[in-house]
């Protein structure tokens, strides 16, 4: 089971996006005697092709993960819709974090990391800026 593997291998799980996964992580953590910190993945653009809890349901998932399953929710992460101004999405994530007392905001990639930092990002993903474009077959 992937949740059990994640608990065994990782200190942080960055993609908690539904209650079913929170339950699986909590059960695996109990069996292993160790619990990774988690970031809740928020689908700020409500894009059907992307994973992540909707912004309007994030508070409930955070509370459930903490109170029902005893998970350490450390922060939030998002990837804004391609072709849209990322700033409103980053501000939405920042407001969710403030409301829930979360310190970690993983948002922003090579093309928008400066905006993400202005909006409070603590983690940015800048692989393309560091290593260049991927060669895709």
What are these model-predicted stretches?
Residues 123, 136-137:
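Active-site loop ensemble at the mouth of alpha/beta enzyme cores that anchors a bound cofactor
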Residues 1-104, 109-111, 117-119, 131-133:
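Conserved alpha/beta-domain cores
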Residues 120-122, 127:
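Active-site-proximal glycine-rich helix-loop-beta segment
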């Amino acid at each position: 089971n992937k949740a059990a593997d994640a608990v065994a291998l990782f200190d942080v799980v960055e993609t908690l996006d539904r209650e079913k996964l929170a339950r699986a992580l909590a059960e695996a953590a109990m069996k292993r005697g160790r619990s990774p910190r988690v970031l809740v993945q928020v689908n700020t653009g409500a894009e059907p092709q992307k994973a992540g809890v909707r912004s309007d349901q994030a508070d409930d998932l955070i509370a459930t993960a903490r109170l029902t399953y005893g998970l350490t929710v450390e922060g939030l992460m998002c990837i804004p819709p391609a072709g849209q101004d990322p700033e409103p999405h980053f501000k939405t994530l920042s407001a969710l974090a403030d409301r829930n007392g979360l310190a970690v905001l993983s948002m922003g990639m090579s093309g928008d990391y400066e905006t993400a930092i202005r909006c409070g990002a603590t983690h940015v993903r800048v692989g393309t800026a560091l290593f260049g474009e991927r060669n895709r077959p």
